């Protein structure tokens, strides 16, 4: 009984200490290499069979809790160093905010939205989203029968736009100023600094056609009951601008994006 009791006590205290984590053969991956790297570099007992040390050099094995604490500490140190580097980059710019080049690199997705293009030459095609919409319509038409496809063609059905509009790419030379979201007039920068030089800003604007047939009113509206007018509407896009205080930055400005019909009911009839 005494021997059994001593065996149970030894087993109990042995379970209180956890062996260090090791990668199982054939199970190495990104998770084990990234998060268990600290366990591999943690001090191990030199008397283990894996190390080949002698019995007199045996040390205590680190517990599972100590191993994870070390991993967490290393992750926090890496995060702190990254934050410190980011603060140092901001201070090196004189505290005046990020430069246009840094902002352009960090927000390159925003620069190529549906109606803004940063390029060294005039774009030859409409924005990508417009082309994707046309391609989708082409795929929809390809799945139709020949008869249905003929009747779905707007020209065959006699469909006409209520208001005639024109769309074209313009630059800051054509659009020198604009209105931002705060209602202030800002100057549109013609060129955007990039690491390899400068690129121009292009805006894809859509407005009512002054030479169209709807300059005197919307098409298809009963003039006996309504007074109609085709008007150009605007939307906000992001562009590199300069305010009245000579501060350059990325702001949302208004550009022409569509031509719509406005109606007014004639009263007294």
UniProtKB/Swiss-Prot annotation:
Q: Which residues form the propeptide?
A: 19-150
Its gene is: bdnf
Q: Which keywords does UniProt give here?
A: Cleavage on pair of basic residues, Disulfide bond, Glycoprotein, Growth factor, Signal
* Free-text function comment from the UniProt entry: BDNF promotes the survival of neuronal populations that are all located either in the central nervous system or directly connected to it.
Q: What is this protein called in UniProt?
A: Neurotrophic factor BDNF precursor form
Q: List the disulfide bonds.
A: 163-230, 208-259, 218-261
Write down a Pfam family by its short name.
Answer: NGF
Q: Which organism is it from?
A: Xiphophorus maculatus (Southern platyfish)
Q: Which PANTHER family match?
A: BRAIN-DERIVED NEUROTROPHIC FACTOR, NERVE GROWTH FACTOR NGF -RELATED
């Amino acid at each position: 009984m005494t021997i059994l009791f001593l065996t149970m006590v030894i087993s109990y205290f042995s379970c209180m200490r956890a062996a260090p984590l090791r990668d199982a053969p054939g199970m190495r991956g990104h998770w084990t290499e990234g998060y268990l790297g600290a366990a591999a570099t943690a001090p191990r007992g030199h008397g283990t069979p894996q190390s080949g040390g002698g019995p007199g050099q045996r040390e205590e094995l680190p517990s599972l809790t100590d191993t994870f604490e070390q991993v967490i500490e290393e992750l926090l140190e890496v995060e702190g160093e990254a934050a410190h580097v980011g603060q140092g980059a901001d201070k090196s710019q004189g505290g005046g905010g990020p430069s246009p080049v840094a902002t352009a690199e960090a927000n390159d997705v925003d620069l190529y939205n549906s109606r803004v293009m940063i390029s060294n030459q005039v774009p030859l095609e409409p924005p990508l989203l417009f082309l994707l919409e046309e391609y989708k319509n082409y795929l929809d038409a390809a799945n139709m029968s020949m008869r249905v496809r003929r009747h779905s063609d707007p020209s065959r059905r006699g469909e006409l736009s209520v208001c005639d509009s024109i769309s074209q790419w313009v630059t800051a030379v054509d659009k020198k100023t604009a209105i931002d979201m705060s209602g202030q007039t800002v100057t549109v920068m013609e060129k955007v600094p990039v690491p390899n030089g400068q690129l121009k800003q292009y805006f894809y604007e859509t407005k009512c056609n002054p030479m169209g047939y709807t300059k005197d009113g919307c098409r298809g509206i009963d003039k006996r009951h309504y007074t109609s007018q085709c008007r150009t509407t605007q939307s906000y896009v992001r562009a590199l601008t300069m305010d009245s205080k000579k501060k350059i930055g990325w702001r949302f400005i208004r550009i022409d994006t569509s031509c719509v019909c406005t109606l007014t009911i004639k009263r007294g009839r």
